[in-house]
A protein has these predicted regions:
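Small-residue-biased structural context
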Residues: 1-138
């Protein structure tokens, strides 16, 4: 399975959002460990936990973006909705798999979820925050 490590470059400069991203990574590290231990029940619970936490994170993030008048908020909200839909599909596919190896590979697809959110989606927010002087470049 892939290695999951927090990098300072992932930070967007808003503590609450950065803390959420770290927690999402921690849950994914737990998913990885459960997959390696072939603990499918724990892995399935953690997939649910990751999606639940992500939903709450997206709500917090969208509220903050609304408060700072982020110009692409509606696009970002739609992006979050798409990520959640894809994550739910991956989760259900993982739960239906019978082979341990295929299950671990399926769980790895979920890792793209955080990477997609942090790298693709939230780096645009980071640029906006830095342009506005709300966050310092790191």
């Amino acid at each position: 399975m892939v290695e999951l490590e927090w990098l300072e470059t992932f930070e967007i400069g808003l503590q609450e959002i950065d803390d959420d991203h770290r927690e999402m990574l921690r849950i994914m590290q737990d998913i990885k460990a459960a997959g390696e231990a072939r603990d499918r029940k724990r892995c399935a619970r953690l997939l649910d936990a990751l999606i639940d936490y992500s939903k709450a994170h997206f709500e917090r993030e969208e509220k903050i973006l609304d408060e700072i008048e982020y110009p692409s908020l509606e696009v970002h909200e739609a992006y979050h909705a798409d990520l959640l839909n894809r994550a739910e599909e991956v989760k259900e596919a993982c739960k239906a798999i019978r082979s341990d190896r295929d299950f671990r590979e399926c769980c790895e697809q979920m890792f793209g979820f955080l990477i997609d959110d942090v790298i693709t989606g939230d780096m645009k927010i980071k640029s906006f925050l830095q342009e506005r002087g709300i966050a310092e470049p790191n």
